[in-house]
Amino acid sequence: MKEIRLILASQSPRRLEILRQIGFQPEVIVSGIEEHTEETIPERVVMDLSRQKAGNVAARLAASLMPVNDLAGRKSRTKAASDRETSGLEAADSRQEPAVVVLGADTVVCTGGRILGKPHSHEEAEEMLRLLQGRTHQVCSGVTLIELRSGRSLTFAEKTEVEVAPMTNKEIHDYAYSAEPMDKAGGYGIQGFFGRYIAGIRGDYTNVVGLPAGAVYQSLKQLFREGQR
C-alpha cells in the first residue's frame, strides 16, 4: 500500500491510539457536525454517522487545498514548450506524494433492540449498565474512508459480541459514577476497569475499544486497489 497521510475525523484518544498501534501517525481534525441520522438499524446508523463525520472534514480540507491546486493548474498551462519534459517529471514526482485519506468513525452498543450511545449523565450510565450486565450485547462500529484527491470512498460496519458477567447493584453504581463511562458508547470501556466484568468476546477486540483495526487496514488496501483499476 502506498504511503498515506491519514486524517482522523474524531477526538477519541482510543481511536488515535489504535491507529498508532498499527503503524499510522494520524493528524486529528475533529468533525463539526451535529450527530443526527434518520437510520434505525445499528449498522446503518454508524455507517451514516461515519460518512457525515468524514465528509465534513474532507470538504473542509478540499476547500483549503483548492487555491493551491488552482495556482498549480494556472502555472502548468503557461509553461513554455521547452519546459514540457521538466513538467512531466514534476507531475510524476507529485504523484508520489502521500495520498490524503480522511477516516470518520462512529460506535454504538446494541442490546434488546435498543441502541446505546454515550451516556449524558452518571444516572444514564447506570441505566445502561443494568441493561448490559449478565447478558450478551453487540458493539457496532461504522467507518468511512475518503481519499481526498480522487474522491474515492469506502464505508463499512463491523460488529462484535460482548458478554458481560452478572454485576451487583454496588458494582454497577460504583462504576457508573466513576470517570470511565462518560465518553464511551454503552457507558463502559473494555480496556479499562470494566474489563473485570467481561465474561467473553466474539469478534474484534479493537472494535469494542472504538475502531476495528484489522478491518480499517484491509479497507485502506482495498481503497487503493480500486484506484489502480
Predicted regions and their residues:
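A generic short alpha-helical patch detector that favors 3-5-residue windows
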Residues: 24-25, 189
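A short beta-strand-loop structural module common to alpha/beta enzyme folds
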Residues: 27-35
